[in-house]
């Protein structure tokens, strides 16, 4: 079970005492979003009556893999990281503009640190 994304895999591997593999230097940036925020945004879209037909479901905030590792360490977890050679297929930075969805969705987003903590607490109960 490799997980469904970097955060999921990093937390599960940390819990199991496995090494987290990071391709490159860990400075690749991604736009992570908490699942509850995705659900709330989708509900906002179901009720949307406007003219736009395309929306980015995103946090509009970039976070690197190194940042994620640091957050796990601040939660007093002990992730063990192995850095592997960078892959040419990995984009350095992916951050989506969420201005359009936020214009119809007025609920503040869950900060990434809180989302990671929430997921970790939920996962501990499930394992």
Annotate each language-model stretch with its function.
Residues 1-6:
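Flexible, glycine-rich beta-alpha linker
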Residues 14-127:
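C-terminal substrate-binding subdomain of Rossmann-fold SDR/epimerase-dehydratase oxidoreductases
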């Amino acid at each position: 079970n490799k997980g469904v994304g970097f955060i999921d895999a990093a937390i599960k591997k940390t819990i199991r005492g496995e090494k987290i593999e990071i391709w490159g230097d860990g400075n690749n940036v991604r736009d992570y979003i908490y699942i509850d925020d995705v659900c709330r945004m989708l509900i906002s879209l179901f009720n949307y009556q406007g003219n736009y037909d395309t929306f980015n479901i995103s946090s509009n905030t970039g976070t690197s893999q190194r940042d994620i590792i640091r957050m796990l360490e601040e939660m007093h977890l002990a992730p063990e990281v192995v850095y592997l050679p960078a892959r040419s297929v990995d984009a350095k930075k992916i951050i989506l503009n969420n201005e359009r969805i936020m214009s119809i969705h007025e609920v503040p987003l869950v900060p990434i640190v809180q989302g990671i903590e929430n997921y970790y607490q939920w996962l501990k109960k499930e394992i």
